[in-house]
């Protein structure tokens, strides 16, 4: 992974977890060829293991194929919640949890 290609390493993205794509606002340009062009996605893999889906791929420079960052996205269902995580030097780090129930018990306000 290349620290010279990104503005900030692993920026906090809150609950924005990307299964695909690139966070171009954090891309300053390729440290190898000094071009700021589109970022390619390469070597994308999807693995389903023990109720967990893991997607990994490489962000690469369009011009010289320099590896900018490795992206990892995970999806699991734990109890009544869908759990998402993302970890990537370019796209950042994020976590999200969404209830699979019609009404999220965590959002229920106490009556008294």
Curated annotation (Swiss-Prot):
InterPro entries xref list: Churchill_sf, Transcrpt_activator_Churchill
Pfam families tied to this protein: Churchill
GO molecular function, one term: zinc ion binding
UniProt key word Metal-binding: yes
Induction remark: Up-regulated by FGF signaling in embryos at mid-gastrulation.
Keyword set includes rRNA-binding: no
GO terms, biological process: cell migration involved in gastrulation; fibroblast growth factor receptor signaling pathway; fibroblast growth factor receptor signaling pathway involved in somitogenesis; negative regulation of cell migration; negative regulation of fibroblast growth factor receptor signaling pathway; positive regulation of DNA-templated transcription; regulation of cell migration; regulation of mesodermal cell fate specification
Keywords: Activator, Developmental protein, Metal-binding, Transcription, Transcription regulation, Zinc
Domain of life: Eukaryota
Binding site for Zn(2+) 3: 59, 71, 88, 91
Residues that coordinate or bind Zn(2+) 2: 30, 33, 61, 64
Binding sites annotated in the UniProt record for Zn(2+) 1: 2, 5, 30, 66
Family: Belongs to the Churchill family.
UniProt function note: Transcriptional activator that mediates FGF signaling during neural development. Plays a role in the regulation of cell movement. Does not bind DNA by itself.
Name assigned to this protein: Protein Churchill
Taxonomic path: Eukaryota, Metazoa, Chordata, Craniata, Vertebrata
Gene field: churc1
């Amino acid at each position: 992974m290349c620290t010279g290609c990104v503005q900030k390493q692993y920026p906090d993205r809150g609950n924005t977890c990307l299964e695909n794509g690139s966070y171009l606002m954090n891309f300053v340009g390729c440290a190898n060829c000094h071009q700021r062009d589109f970022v390619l996605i390469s070597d994308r893999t999807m693995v389903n293991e023990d109720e967990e889906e893991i997607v990994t791929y490489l962000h690469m420079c369009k011009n010289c194929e320099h590896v900018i960052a490795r992206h990892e996205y995970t999806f699991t269902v734990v109890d009544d919640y869908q759990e998402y995580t993302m970890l990537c030097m370019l796209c950042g780090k994020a976590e999200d949890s969404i209830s699979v129930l019609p009404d999220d018990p965590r959002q229920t306000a106490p009556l008294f």
